[in-house]
């Protein structure tokens, strides 16, 4: 791709993204991670307490309507974890509809019309700065996004070169990894880069080859979110569901629960919101699990 490329350290990227001029997060502010209901695909929106946003993947078709409903009027960062259509199919419409400042992928190319359309669009957009996925830390306001090392595999093994991201806001954290399979997950375990996390996006839509017991033991998620829709692959597989149910307190699925939003607080507390978010319920939390409509509060 011939659009603007930048290969920089995390410190330099902070300056590029304007994090030095954003107001610090205040007590009680939160990160929001929303798993958009895009059917059999992935699209995850990260919003920092300061209002900066990152979209990780964009589903088969355009998620713009959902992003507009969430008041997203620009994206600081757009990430394609790997070049499969159920992850990049909606990106052209996102790029053409919403200002995007930075775009990151793993450097793999594909021969599909979907990928070639995305590449052509990006070539024409010199206003979007390109970032190659390599170990780095990206600051999205007070949220830190760690990019994990990619597995050196064959150029046609797209799933096992999915970009892995660890998202942190204080004691709250999330792990996102596209369609990573056993080989890539095991590599991260061996490298010791899988931390305890609050939220895990199930790799590869809950596939039988999208988890290992060692990976789940390291991650120790409290919530597993499975982005999945009608499919002929059997996702999520029974083995994966059993493993997630054993490992985590809560397992959620976009095909059953709709859009899933995790509201995370700096002290590690979090709330789960299913469907459209009810912003009026931000105050008045009490100990234990509270339920108001479709808002579930964990402390």
Q: What kind of feature is each model-predicted range?
A:
Residues 2-5, 13-299:
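Non-globular, low-confidence helical/coil segments that flank catalytic cores
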């Amino acid at each position: 791709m011939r659009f603007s490329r930048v290969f920089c350290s995390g410190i330099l990227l902070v300056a590029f993204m304007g994090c030095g001029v954003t107001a610090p997060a205040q007590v009680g502010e939160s990160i929001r991670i929303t798993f958009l209901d895009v059917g059999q695909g992935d699209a995850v929106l990260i919003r920092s307490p300061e209002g900066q946003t990152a979209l990780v993947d964009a589903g088969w078709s355009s998620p713009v309507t959902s992003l507009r409903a969430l008041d997203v009027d620009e994206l600081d960062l757009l990430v394609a974890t790997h070049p499969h259509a159920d992850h990049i199919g909606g990106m052209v419409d996102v790029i053409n509809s919403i200002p995007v400042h930075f775009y990151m992928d793993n450097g793999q190319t594909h021969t599909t019309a979907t990928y070639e359309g995305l590449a052509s669009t990006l070539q024409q957009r010199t206003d979007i700065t390109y970032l190659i996925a390599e170990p780095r830390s990206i600051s999205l306001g007070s949220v830190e996004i760690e990019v994990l090392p990619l597995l050196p595999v064959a150029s046609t093994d797209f799933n096992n070169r999915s970009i892995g991201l660890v998202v942190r806001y204080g004691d709250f954290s999330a792990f996102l990894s596209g369609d990573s399979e056993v080989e890539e997950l095991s590599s991260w375990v061996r490298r010791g880069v899988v931390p305890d996390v609050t939220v895990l996006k199930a790799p590869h839509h809950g596939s039988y080859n999208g988890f290992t017991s060692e990976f789940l033991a390291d991650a120790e998620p409290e919530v597993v979110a499975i982005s999945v829709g009608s499919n002929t692959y059997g996702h999520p597989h029974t083995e994966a569901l059993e493993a997630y149910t054993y490992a985590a307190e809560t397992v959620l699925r976009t095909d059953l629960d709709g859009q899933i939003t995790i509201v995370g607080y700096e002290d590690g507390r979090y709330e789960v919101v299913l469907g459209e978010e009810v912003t009026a319920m931000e105050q008045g939390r009490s100990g234990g699990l509270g339920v108001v409509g479709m808002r579930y509060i964990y402390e």
